[in-house]
Amino acid sequence: AMQPAEYVEFLVERIANVVAQAWAARKPASAGWGLGHAVLAINRRSVYADGTAQMYGPTDAANFRGFEGGEDHGVEVLCFWDADGKLIATSINVACPAQEVEGLWQIDADLWHPVREALRAKHGNDLVVLAWTGAAGDQSPHLMYNKRAEERMRELRKLTRLEELSRRIVAGWDEAHEGATQERHGDVEFKHTVETIDLPLRVVTDEEYANANAK
């Protein structure tokens, strides 16, 4: 099997070639952006009355008090049109990892595959759909709360879980696209900026250290 270092070399070469080809083939176009919403991920760390937290911890326990952090339901969208006004590409950013399907010996796009299929059915098979996973630390698409209600509604819609998640993304994309298409810009500045941000470290208490060593 290909090792990580080998795959990086394999991938970087191909990405570089695609970028060079795209740059050489660039043509006049316009861009627009918009914001929609979709409930996709939830914080996966349950918090209990004694102050402890557990990853994927049960939420039906009597001492369950909430989740360790919040979630971001924004669907940030970029759209690109050619000189004739045809939608040729879109990028979609959601704060949710593509990991609804796990533990299988296969490589797939998870929830993004049905998203691409749905958008291409509306806007043409040659539409490029670029998926971005935003800031999604401790976020998960796995159901943590209202499980029975969520599953009931999904079954009534006769959808798989992947189809349900993609349905929400596409609905959010439609909201964003409706706004983006009204403000198309042909003179957008193209630049690359990198910033290094210093974040404070979380200090482990003596009690937490002792508990961790005791396990």
Predicted regions and their residues:
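Non-catalytic substrate/cofactor recognition surfaces at enzyme active-site rims
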Residues: 1-215
